[in-house]
Amino acid sequence: MSRTVLVSGGSGYIAGFLIRQLVAEGWTVRTTVRSLAKEAPVRDLLAVDNSRLRFFAADLNADAGWAEAMAGCSHVAHVASPLPASVPKDANELIVPARDGALRALRAAKAAGVKRVVMTSSVAAISYGRGRGVHHFTEADWTDASQPGISAYIQSKTIAERAARAWVAAEGGAMEFCSICPSVVLGPVWSRDYSASLVIVKKLLDGSMSACPDIGFGIVDVRDVADLHVLALNAPGMAGERFIASGRFMKLREIADVLRAHLGAEANKVTTRDVPDWLVRISALFNPLAKAVVGELGNVRNQDASHALAVLGWKTRPEEQSIVDCARSLLALGLVRP
């Protein structure tokens, strides 16, 4: 029996890999884009069986299009969410579309008789607002978005997932809901319109990051994130589940060293210098990017993905492979010139 799934945000990084895998596994896939002008270029990039993929125009900020996109679907992967390339002036520019878009998708899914929704959240909803130091996080943890210094992006992911879970508990009926919380998503780039999560690798490669501050993050491969979504769509008993999707925590210095070790002359611009904490703190007085970084200095956030490994049998690639594959694809696409 053919299974039909809606993947929201079809032009996005995670969604593209997810669509490819779902089509390969025999699903009939529908996907949303903000404008159908994106359909032709996205189809060309995906290079899948076009008879198994349909596009619909739907925006996180409006009701139009969602009912049509959901009609006949048994499953939904709600992947679409705003991810800015720069810090917004008003946090609500991210919070409102993330929260309201998730609720809009859930309401449309219930009205269409969808059996299960898998929502792409983030470790941003899990591992912030706990103070400085070395921390270990599981799916039981939640970010305290009320703490000072929490960025608009972190607030948006936390508020959106909490709102989605509250709505499902109150209004979802028999519809199942689970969430997947990736860390920083790296891996091969499939488009010149690349995800904001890849900017760090790009800046290291092109030399625009002239020194590494003492910060880091968990890393996960985009292909493994897509795998985890497929597992969550297929597995029984997913109602209420939450899965961290992350590998090990790596400092920027470690990432830079991986690039230099594997790319030879193509990594000649990758910095070998570290920036001292005191200089980051001074820069934060007048530089908004430094201000966003200063609260992360010295922090280690270990996000434990053992639940996904144990419950769903999820398997992950080495972090080094994700970093190198990301870098090589940026170079191959001409997005970075060595």
Give, region by region, the residue ranges found by the protein language model:
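Active-site Tyr-X1-5-Lys
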Residues: 147-177
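A conserved pocket-lining segment of Rossmann-fold NAD(P)-dependent short-chain dehydrogenase/reductase
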Residues: 87-88, 144-150, 191-192, 198-220, ...
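Glycine/proline-rich active-site loop of Rossmann-fold NAD(P)-dependent oxidoreductases
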Residues: 172-175, 187-199, 232-243
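NAD(P)H-binding glycine-rich loop region in Rossmannoid oxidoreductase-like domains
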Residues: 36-41, 46-100
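Conserved Rossmann-fold NAD(P)-dependent oxidoreductase catalytic core, especially the SDR/UDP-sugar
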Residues: 78, 82, 87-153
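N-terminal Rossmann NAD(P)H-binding glycine-rich loop of SDR-like oxidoreductase domains
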Residues: 3-27
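Mid/C-terminal beta-alpha module of Rossmann-like enzyme folds, strongest
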Residues: 228-292, 310, 319-338
